[in-house]
């Protein structure tokens, strides 16, 4: 397991040319690390949380690399719960790499998902919310985005906690009925406890079913176009995608290998396959 006391860093934006690129650092001492390479060192070191500071970023040898905007987040008021600083620079891959290489002299590159792992370990989110972060990033349709966002906001966590509270309360009532059965005390109604147990089981089953719905939202509903050769499977495939993805000719047997594409239908992710004709 990674050492959570280490400073970690990673680009937050995709590789390639863009207007802006962002590099995030997290961990005790990350603000001081960046300050050593920043034109307004004292201003940065004394900066409060949730503050923006503009200035120049310098290499280890003191050579200016780029003008940057720093976003400061003091613990525990950050994504990871630790001190966090984000460097916004111009989105030239060469500039990003030079800044990153300078930083990496004093810290290490974050592993995939490590910022979210630290947020989980520091109590900034629970496991359900941590999973929702990845679901929201990977969502390919509107409904998948909405479901992931609700989970990230803690809707599933609150639902699970309420269910757990009901189970705990029912367990206490059962234990009370068992431990004091031989004493002349008012005990919980057994029929009421049984009905509560049945209702809890029903609720748990409903929750389990939503898991299957969530899987379909994440992975997409799979649709396979099959049929005899030259009946229009590839034409339908292209029409659904609204692009000429498959070759269409009057001659049968044009499609030899299956084609796979993702699309959104009414906000739901769909994985559609175009296949060779059945003979």
Indicate residue ranges for each PLM-predicted region.
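A glycine-rich (often HGG/GG-containing) alpha/beta subdomain
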Residues: 1-146, 150, 154
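Long, non-coiled-coil amphipathic alpha-helical linker/lever segments
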Residues: 124-203, 207
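Short, charged low-complexity intrinsically disordered segments located at boundaries
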Residues: 61-71, 127-134, 160-168, 201-208, ...
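Conserved G1/Walker A P-loop phosphate-binding module
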Residues: 17-25, 37-39, 173-279
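Detector for Asparagine
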Residues: 3, 51, 92-97, 101, ...
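Residue-identity detector for threonine
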Residues: 13, 61, 80, 102, ...
């Amino acid at each position: 397991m990674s050492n959570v006391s280490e400073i970690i860093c990673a680009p937050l934006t995709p590789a390639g040319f863009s207007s802006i690129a962002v590099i995030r650092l997290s961990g005790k001492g990350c603000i001081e690390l960046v300050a050593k390479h920043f034109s307004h060192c004292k201003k940065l070191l004394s900066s409060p949380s949730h503050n923006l500071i503009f200035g120049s970023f310098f290499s280890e040898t003191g050579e200016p690399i780029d003008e940057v905007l720093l976003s400061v987040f003091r613990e525990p008021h950050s994504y990871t719960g630790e001190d966090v600083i984000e460097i916004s620079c111009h989105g030239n891959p060469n500039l990003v790499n030079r800044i990153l290489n300078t930083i990496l002299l004093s810290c290490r590159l974050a592993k995939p998902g490590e910022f979210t792992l630290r947020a989980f370990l520091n109590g900034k989110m629970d496991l359900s919310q941590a999973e929702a972060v990845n679901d929201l990033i990977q969502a390919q349709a509107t409904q998948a985005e909405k479901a992931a966002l609700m989970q990230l906001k803690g809707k599933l966590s609150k639902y699970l906690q309420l269910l757990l509270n009901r189970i705990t309360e029912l367990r206490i009532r059962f234990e009370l009925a068992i431990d004091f059965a031989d004493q002349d005390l008012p005990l919980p109604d057994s029929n009421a406890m049984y009905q509560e147990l049945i209702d809890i089981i029903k609720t748990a089953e409903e929750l389990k079913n939503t898991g299957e719905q969530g899987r379909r939202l994440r992975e997409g509903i799979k649709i396979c176009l099959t049929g005899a050769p030259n009946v229009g499977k590839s034409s339908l495939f292209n029409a659904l995608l609204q692009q000429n993805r498959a070759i269409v000719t009057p001659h049968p047997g044009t499609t030899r290998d299956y084609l796979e594409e993702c699309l959104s239908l009414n906000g739901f992710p769909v994985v559609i396959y175009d296949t060779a004709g059945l003979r």
